[in-house]
A protein has these predicted regions:
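Bacterial N-terminal signal peptides that target proteins for export
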Residues: 2-13
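Beta-propeller-forming repeat regions
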Residues: 26-226
Length: 226
């Protein structure tokens, strides 16, 4: 009986130490650095992405604003500072809920897709933006007359870049809510919605979407729908 108690003592002692060490490891894995965000005021923000916003070779955080300006946070002097000064990017009149960045037109620079949603479901008032840069100024590819027939005027929730062929050429999957899913690619310098051709134009309550090597070595898509 005594030997059994000793064994149990050691067993539970080891278990206790493992729990303590695990908790300590978890506690030290992340560090709260919120204090380095300059002007970190309360606001509604639902989306974030990372890209080289100003083509200086460094990446910035792109943070959406839902009724607030979109931000481009750059790490400078030990702080995360908003370096955006362009109205078309901040877009305070829109309610931006998602953002993704990838080189959709194969020019070596990542374009920025802002998913705007001003209604809960179905038809919305303001279309999304696909921002490209020229002479250090952003402009919206969707505002070009040739691209207006493919505007997304459906409420959405999430957006993700997808390399569907595995060749480094990206398309943009837009999870809409109460309307068909969109899948944009650029073909012959025109924005094309390829969702129907790819059998993705389902009408559902699209909530979330992620792309990666989930089941195969190609870029799979996991879509969370209601």
């Amino acid at each position: 009986m005594f030997i059994k108690k000793i064994k149990n003592f050691y067993k539970y002692s080891i278990l206790f130490l493992l729990i303590i060490l695990t908790n300590n490891t978890r506690a030290e894995f992340f560090e709260d650095l919120s204090k380095i965000i300059e002007n970190n005021e309360k606001r509604l923000s639902y989306g974030i992405s990372v890209t080289d916003f100003n083509m200086d070779g460094n990446n910035e955080f792109l943070v959406t604003g839902f009724g607030f300006p979109n931000l481009a946070l750059s790490f400078q002097d030990g702080k995360l500072k908003n370096i955006n000064q362009q109205k078309i990017f901040s877009d305070i009149s829109k309610k931006t809920i998602g953002v993704a960045a990838c080189d959709i037109d194969k020019d070596g620079f990542e374009e920025i897709y802002f998913l705007n949603t001003d209604t809960y479901s179905g038809v919305k008032k303001y279309s999304d933006r696909l921002l490209d840069i020229k002479d250090n100024n952003y402009f919206d590819l969707f505002e070009l007359e040739k691209n207006k027939e493919n505007l997304n005027l459906t409420a959405g929730r999430s957006v993700v870049c997808v390399d569907r062929k595995g060749d480094g050429e990206y398309g943009i999957y837009v999870a809409n809510y109460g309307g068909p899913t969109r899948f944009y690619e650029i073909e012959n310098e025109l924005i094309k919605d390829k969702a129907k051709n790819l059998n993705l134009d389902n009408i559902t309550g699209g909530r979330a979407v992620v792309s990666g090597h989930i089941l195969t070595e190609r870029a799979d898509i996991f879509a969370a729908n209601e």
